């Protein structure tokens, strides 16, 4: 954990960019030391905070940065579609490794641990709690429970075709309801990230467009292939 108080953490990331340093799974950059380097480079570039997946990656990154870290663990479970920080042990491990904010799946889906139990554990361990939601109803429920941050993270990712654009309406609605809002999900250009802040997001997380080199190169390569020469 950084040496910032909870209010200082929120003030530090307010109106700022959160760099999600999550390399492609099992890719050449999927190494804790590389994730830590990504995090440091992101802060040099102007990020206000970081989102780090995995306990080992968090352990490698925390000693190298003072900025707030949102931490998660992703798992693929046989009996639940929930992937983001599904177990209390994940929360324990992330808190011990230095997370400032722990994010959990806030969707209304079958899960191994209730959202209420996850929130209780996060706060007991002295961390701020973030809910990754997909709908306004989920976000409002998590706000009422006492989550410190509500994210649009899961919008478009709980079934059906994934949209191309971010869910601006969800961000607006969450803000109108009084949430501390993290815009997240498909904010893959500076213009889109700027728009998120302009419509009311307290901060915005960007991932693939910053730290997934395979994806970024692919965007360029695919576009070049369509060039008329």
Curated annotation (Swiss-Prot):
PANTHER family on file: N-ACETYLMANNOSAMINE-6-PHOSPHATE 2-EPIMERASE-RELATED (PTHR36204:SF1)
Gene Ontology CC terms: cytosol
One GO process term, biological-process aspect: N-acetylneuraminate catabolic process
Keyword terms of this UniProt record: Carbohydrate metabolism, Isomerase
Organism per entry: Actinobacillus pleuropneumoniae serotype 3 (strain JL03)
Pathway membership, UniProt: Amino-sugar metabolism; N-acetylneuraminate degradation; D-fructose 6-phosphate from N-acetylneuraminate: step 3/5
Catalytic activity annotation: an N-acyl-D-glucosamine 6-phosphate = an N-acyl-D-mannosamine 6-phosphate
Identification of the protein by name: Putative N-acetylmannosamine-6-phosphate 2-epimerase
Domain of life according to the entry: Bacteria
One example GO MF annotation: N-acylglucosamine-6-phosphate 2-epimerase activity
EC category: isomerase
């Amino acid at each position: 954990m950084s040496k910032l108080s909870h209010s200082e953490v929120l003030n530090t990331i307010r109106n700022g960019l959160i760099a999600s340093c999550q390399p492609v799974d099992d890719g050449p950059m999927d190494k804790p030391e590389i994730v830590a380097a990504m995090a440091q480079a992101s802060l040099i570039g102007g990020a206000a905070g970081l989102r780090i997946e995995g306990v080992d990656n968090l352990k490698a990154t925390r000693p190298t940065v003072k900025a707030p870290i949102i931490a998660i663990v992703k798992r693929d479970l046989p009996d639940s579609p929930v992937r983001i920080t599904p177990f209390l042990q994940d929360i324990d491990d992330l808190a011990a490794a230095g997370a400032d904010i722990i994010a959990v799946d806030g969707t209304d889906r079958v899960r191994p641990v209730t959202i209420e139990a996850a929130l209780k554990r996060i706060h007991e361990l002295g961390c701020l709690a973030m809910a990754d939601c997909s709908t306004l109803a989920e976000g409002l429920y998590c706000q009422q429970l006492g989550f410190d941050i509500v994210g649009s993270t899961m919008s478009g990712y709980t079934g059906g075709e994934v949209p191309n654009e971010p869910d601006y309406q969800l961000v607006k609605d969450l803000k109108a309801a009084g949430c501390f809002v993290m815009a997240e999900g498909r904010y893959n250009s500076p213009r889109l990230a700027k728009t998120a802040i302009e419509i009311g997001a307290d901060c915005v997380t960007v991932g693939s467009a910053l730290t997934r080199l395979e994806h970024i190169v692919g965007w360029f390569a695919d576009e070049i292939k369509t060039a008329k020469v």
